[in-house]
Amino acid sequence: MGSFSIWHWLIVLVIVMLVFGTKKLRNIGQDLGGAVKGFKDGMKDADAAADASTQQKISGGQTLEGEAREKVEKTHS
């Protein structure tokens, strides 16, 4: 039973092309490509907005109060 070989996938592809036709498959491919492009553009816009928000917070002149600690490396002699 194992995995499908390349011949199985080619037969499935031919059957799908016969059932739906190449024009319908082309339209589905274009719609899917447009959706992926829209998603990527949306993610890019969200990242740009997050970066701008972070830069605005940093340049706001805020000071963080805290305690600095030295990192001491211990060596075994």
UniProtKB/Swiss-Prot annotation:
Gene Ontology MF terms: protein transmembrane transporter activity
Xref: Pfam families: TatA_B_E
UniProt topology in membrane: Single-pass membrane protein
Gene Ontology CC: one annotated term: TAT protein transport complex
Keyword field contains Cytoplasm: no
Compartments where found: Cell inner membrane
Biased composition (Basic and acidic residues): 66-77
Biological process per Gene Ontology, one example term: protein transport by the Tat complex
Keywords: Cell inner membrane, Cell membrane, Membrane, Protein transport, Translocation, Transmembrane, Transmembrane helix, Transport
Bias type Polar residues, positions: 53-62
Region (Disordered): 50-77
Transmembrane feature ranges: 1-21
InterPro entries on file: TatA/B/E, TatA/E
Similarity comment: Belongs to the TatA/E family.
Function (record text): Part of the twin-arginine translocation (Tat) system that transports large folded proteins containing a characteristic twin-arginine motif in their signal peptide across membranes. TatA could form the protein-conducting channel of the Tat system.
NCBIfam families: PRK02958.1 (NF002813), tatAE (TIGR01411)
Oligomeric and partner information: The Tat system comprises two distinct complexes: a TatABC complex, containing multiple copies of TatA, TatB and TatC subunits, and a separate TatA complex, containing only TatA subunits. Substrates initially bind to the TatABC complex, which probably triggers association of the separate TatA complex to form the active translocon.
Protein name (record): Sec-independent protein translocase protein TatA
Record lineage: Bacteria, Pseudomonadati, Pseudomonadota, Betaproteobacteria, Rhodocyclales
